[in-house]
């Protein structure tokens, strides 16, 4: 490890590859709440947070693990579940009195049509005003999971083990979305 007066150790969360402080400062300067979208292969999480003196304050949050309460039987790490998680977080934020936000994608790459932007699209459809470019949002057919259903129909054996049939994903998506909308009217 380098030593001496000219060597500067990066901040701990930057060394752990967890925080981009330059991006965080730009988002905080906007003065708007942040829609923090974090995705993994298994789950999706969305939170609306504002900076506070003792750390960020969370006003509304949703996880794809909660979608089971609304009847979601499909896996929770795909694009349709990311949209539904964003919609659920956006609906909770609107219920909490928030009406605008900026998207915080963290260290994720801004690839058009990915799950992070599906979270944003869900929050926008729930009633939040988030500045965005429509080119980064996925097609509605992809958001509903029609690409997953088409792939499942090509297979000889079921795509997922268990009771859920992936070929029915678009209809299942519509049913769960309607349930969430009824719950947050």
Swiss-Prot record:
Subunit and partners: Part of the 50S ribosomal subunit. Contacts the 5S and 23S rRNAs.
InterPro entries recorded: Rbsml_uL18_euk
GO biological process, one term: translation
Domain of life: Archaea
Pfam families (UniProt xref): Ribosomal_L5e
PANTHER family membership: LARGE RIBOSOMAL SUBUNIT PROTEIN UL18, RIBOSOMAL PROTEIN L5-RELATED
Family under the similarity heading: Belongs to the universal ribosomal protein uL18 family.
Function: This is one of the proteins that bind and probably mediate the attachment of the 5S RNA into the large ribosomal subunit, where it forms part of the central protuberance.
UniProt keyword terms in alphabetical order: Ribonucleoprotein, Ribosomal protein, RNA-binding, rRNA-binding
GO MF term (any one): 5S rRNA binding
Organism: Halorubrum lacusprofundi (strain ATCC 49239 / DSM 5036 / JCM 8891 / ACAM 34)
GO CC annotations on file: cytosolic large ribosomal subunit
Name of the featured protein: Large ribosomal subunit protein uL18
Alphabetized SUPFAM superfamilies for the sequence: Translational machinery components
